[in-house]
Amino acid sequence: LNLKGLIKKVASLLN
């Protein structure tokens, strides 16, 4: 699991 990628993906969805 790519945590950095996941965080970035979630941040992108939130913005």
UniProtKB/Swiss-Prot annotation:
Q: Decide whether keyword Ligase is in the record.
A: no
Summary of the tissues where the protein is detected? Expressed by the venom gland.
Primary location class: secreted
Q: Which GO terms describe its biological process?
A: defense response to bacterium; defense response to fungus; innate immune response; killing of cells of another organism
Its GO CC terms are: extracellular region; membrane; other organism cell membrane
Q: Where in the cell is it found?
A: Secreted; Target cell membrane
Give the UniProt keywords, A-Z: Antibiotic, Antimicrobial, Fungicide, G-protein coupled receptor impairing toxin, Immunity, Innate immunity, Mast cell degranulation, Membrane, Secreted, Target cell membrane, Target membrane, Toxin, Transmembrane
Q: Which GO terms describe its molecular function?
A: toxin activity
The keyword Secreted is annotated on this UniProt entry? yes
What this protein is reported to do is described as: Linear cationic alpha-helical peptide with antimicrobial activities against both Gram-positive and Gram-negative strains and against the yeast C.albicans. Shows moderate mast cell degranulation and leishmanicidal activities. Has a very low hemolytic activity. Induces an ion channel-like incorporation in artificial lipid bilayers, forming pores with relativeley high conductances. Its mast cell degranulation activity may be related to the activation of G-protein coupled receptors in mast cells as well as interaction with other proteins located in cell endosomal membranes in the mast cells.
* Family the UniProt entry places it in: Belongs to the MCD family. Eumenitin subfamily.
Q: What is this protein called?
A: Eumenitin-R
State the organism of origin: Eumenes rubrofemoratus (Solitary wasp)
- Upper taxonomic classification of the species? Eukaryota, Metazoa, Ecdysozoa, Arthropoda, Hexapoda
